[in-house]
Swiss-Prot record:
GO molecular function: toxin activity
Family in the record: Belongs to the scorpion La1-like peptide family.
Keyword Signal annotated: yes
Keyword Disulfide bond: yes
Signal peptide segment: 1-20
Description of post-translational modifications: Contains 4 disulfide bonds.
InterPro entries: SVWC_dom
GO cellular component: extracellular region
Protein's recorded name: Venom peptide Pc
Top-rank taxon: Eukaryota
Tissue expression per record: Expressed by the venom gland.
């Protein structure tokens, strides 16, 4: 059992050192260089360097509570972020989808 702990600690340390040395972030099957952003489905990832640490930031669509007289309108899931996020349309303001010119 102690050999397993040592192996896990070694792998975690190796991963931490490798991530900083290559200056990139790993998420899912993506490799994102420091200073770059990349999208995967409706999530936007940004790999940054902060205080000599490689940091992965992710942005997703926020949950919104619906008020009376409003409805949630789904967006196209393959659209770039944040256009893939659903919108809320309210009666009296913008009940219908905005018209494109």
């Amino acid at each position: 059992m102690s050999h397993l702990r040592i192996a896990v600690i070694f792998l975690c340390t190796l991963f931490a050192l490798t991530a900083g040395a290559e200056e990139s972030c790993q998420v899912g099957g993506l490799t994102i260089p420091v200073g770059k952003t990349q999208q995967d489905r409706c999530t936007l990832y940004e790999c940054t360097m902060e205080s000599n640490r490689v940091v992965l930031k992710s942005m997703i669509c926020a949950e919104q509570s619906l008020r009376r007289g409003c409805k949630r309108v789904p967006a196209q899931a393959t659209a770039p972020f944040p256009d893939c996020c659903p919108t809320t349309l309210c009666r009296g303001r913008q009940w219908d989808r905005p018209r494109t010119l």
